[in-house]
Structures are given as structure tokens and as C-alpha cells.
Amino acid sequence: QFENPYSTEKYNKVTDGTDRVYKRAKELGVKVAFGTDALFDPAAAAAQGRMLAKLKRWYTPYEILKMATSTNAELLMLCGPRNPYRLGPIGVIEEGAYADMLLIDGNPLENIDLVANPDENFVMIMKDGKVYKNTIQ
């Protein structure tokens, strides 16, 4: 995988550890949030959907979508005064909540791989009530 054998060995250890952690977390019913540290790297940020879709190895599409939405919101609310979303609930679609929504061309509950290609499959992207993409016809 890598030219440097040490890097390959390290990568394999991380991969093996990741497999064990996700399996054990699911067995124990641990709430898992989805996130990355790719905030300031556009190339890495673009890969987040692919990373999310890879979770199908351990979770159902429903569990993956819940993890990335309402469970993330629930766990974020635990950060107390550091919570940037104090004006309304997040992770839900209801009156007074932050209006963050994705509309996907297809059913990600049947095919979670749809989230791996947002440029093609996300037909509407809304963040805090502002529409950033709308290709609905």
C-alpha cells in the first residue's frame, strides 16, 4: 500500500483497531458520532461521503444516517457552553430547529453508497435555512 513498509504496518494496525472498535461499540450500544478532521482540506472534506458509506461494513444504512445526523446532534449538545447551536434544536426537522437538510436522488436507506458522491446525488443542500444547491426539477 505504501512505499515505506513502516507506514504500511502502521496503517494495517490502525485498520485492524478500527474494525475491533466499531464491532465492540455496536455490541455494547455505544453512541458513535461521525466526523473527520478534514475541516480545512477541501480534498479530504470531499471524501467524507465515501468515508460515511464505508461504515456499511459495521452498520446498516439507517444506523449510518442516524449516526451522522441526530446522534451527532445529540452528542454535540453535550459540549455545553461551547455549543455553537444554542438558538434551536439540531438533528431534527421541526419548527424552530436549524434548517440543515440534504435531499438525495435515490434512497440511501436502500443504497448508502449514494452519499459517497454528493456532487451527483445530492439534489438539494440547505444549511441553517440557506439553500446552497438546488437541482430539483
Model regions and ranges:
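Short, Lys/Arg- and Gly-enriched loop/turn segments at beta-strand edges
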Residues: 108-114
